[in-house]
Amino acid sequence: MKYLVIAEKPSVARSISKVIGAYKHEDGYLEGGDCVVSWCLGHLAEYAAPEYYDERYKSWRFDDLPILPEEWKLLVSEDKKAHFNILRKLLRSKDFDYVVNACDAGREGEAIFRRVYGLADSKLPVKRLWISSMEDSAIQQGFDSLKDGAEYDNLFAASECRAKADWLIGMNGTRAFTKKYGRRQTIGRVQTPTLAMLTERQNKIQNFVKEPYYKVEITGNGIVAESERMAQEQDADTMQAACDGQCAVVGSIERKRKEQSAPKLYDLTTLQREANRYYGFTASQTLKIVQELYEEKLVTYPRTDSQYITEDMQQTMADLLKHYGGEADGVKQVVNNKKVTDHHAILPTLESCKRGSNSLSGDKEKVFALIVWKMQQAVQPPYIYEDVLVTVCCQDRKFTAKYKNVLQAGHTAMPVPFAEQEKSKDMAFPKKLEQGEVIPVVSAEKKQGFTSPPKAFTEDTLLSAMESAGNKEFEKDTEKKGLGTPATRAAILEKLVSSGYVERKGKQILPSAEGVTAIANIPDYLKSASMTAEWENELLRMERGETKPADFMQGIGGLLERMLADLRQIPTVQESPIYNKVSIGNCPVCGKLVCEGKLNFYCSDRDCKFALWKESKYLSGMKKTLTKKMATDLLKKGRTYAKDFYSAKKDKTFAADLVMAIENGRAQYSLEFPKTPAKK
């Protein structure tokens, strides 16, 4: 039997081809024996913008809302049409007995294949390759146990409902709020509640009023004990005067033995959080790196929400620990069949043991080392310690001293790779100290402190907040998935940054002035983290066949009706032409939005002179016009690649990187000639 295989991207297709023997390169696919392998280039087809349903939607009018497609249209982008035509021809071919969906084993991978399959109007029976590793053995095992494609109908339904909900809320909400408030406001099903979390935290920080407090600290015989906080400095002065130079007595010594189990293995969100905490990586940066490690067969499937492995993987993990070092006896700590759905936790592969990680360097080496470290740490014994609370009495006043005795370092003894190790601030308990012991003389000192505001979010803490969003509103046994999914949270953060609503300052991620203004107009139910988290749970139930797509979409429709009804009651604000423009990035001089004009790409701040001119002397000499994509790249990366610069001296075109530098608030260009083209 001859069969067709469609992977998500060329690199995965090549890995599959080597296993099943498709070595012959053709235009857009590989062939060999009884199989042909092609690929999708990621999302080949996306839902069409409103104007493709009706030309009147090219102009934004509140009265046209809501836009509710009766029949959803999928469009293939111009730069992918040629490859789609190859796929369509293959999918319609009568040479094949069936087609294998080899796209990523998850919600989005299912949608990528199904959309292409549907657009091609293919009648081929579908089988599903579902694997958690790109190792040759895993691929072969997957082909030996292909699933019926129909088993994943519910997964596809959940993916389509998610995409349609995002489209309906995004397209209608953005147009509605933009037209009503006279400035462009981007609305998103997950983006808006996330921005609301950031602005709420920022408001608490900005409105926080620090208040002084006072303590008295007494010292004697190696003991340092402190009083409770006092609001009045006079009370602290009185206590200090009463105790200074006096004797004290150890009143009580309370000991509490505690255990802290080893942390679980990495799911994607936890890996992103810790890579941000230890290395400062953004969530999208970590996702990109771990995806590359997966495609290079060094780690297992990364877009997982599980921190466990199944029982049948115990020997595999024991073999990994034997190679990398670790307590194989502790593997049972991370085994839980009930907590593994589509994919187990992220692990290094057995292939990585054979190949080694010596070829890795830089950021890739750090992320791989972090995954190995977490595997080793997860099987370690618990951290066992003793909290000791000592009460000291002086002049009828009570002071306390806190100590911590480490009884077993356990998993905490493993240092984080490539990271500066944190020094413990805990003090060990003085062994000679006994209850009733008299301290002949103590010195007393007044200490002043101030209450502190909440900390600004980092990507580490924001990802944690997104993951746990709405938990308090759910029943105890409810499956909780928070805002977004492990696979989508990084993209949500990047969209907030690129829209100008959020900015990074060091490790902190903060709402911009534009973001604070935008969220102020949005009603609470659109900002609700618990409602959005409940939608994610509905999608999970849909994957299991417990919720009907029609019921989910009816709920989304009801939300749209409520939103538009509420907005109709609000007077329309006169439009601001600047904020009705689509921004292409942030100004490198002042940080405000950069918009496209007729002749240039200009900073929206009228006091800022920064602009990128479409026609400039520098580029005109090489017969080059600055395109929107080039300008976007320059703002984001400081450089852009093009292959049609013209050399008058040689009378031919050439490829190079156009590099931007800022001098006195203006853009200056230069060319660089890398050995390999910069990423577009």
Question: What would you call each of these model-derived segments?
Answer:
Residues W72-L75, C103, K123-K127, D148-L155, ...:
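Short, polar/flexible loop-turn hinges at active-site or ligand-entry regions and domain interfaces
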Residues A150, E233-Y266, Q272, S530:
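Metal- or metallocofactor-binding catalytic centers and their adjacent structured scaffolds
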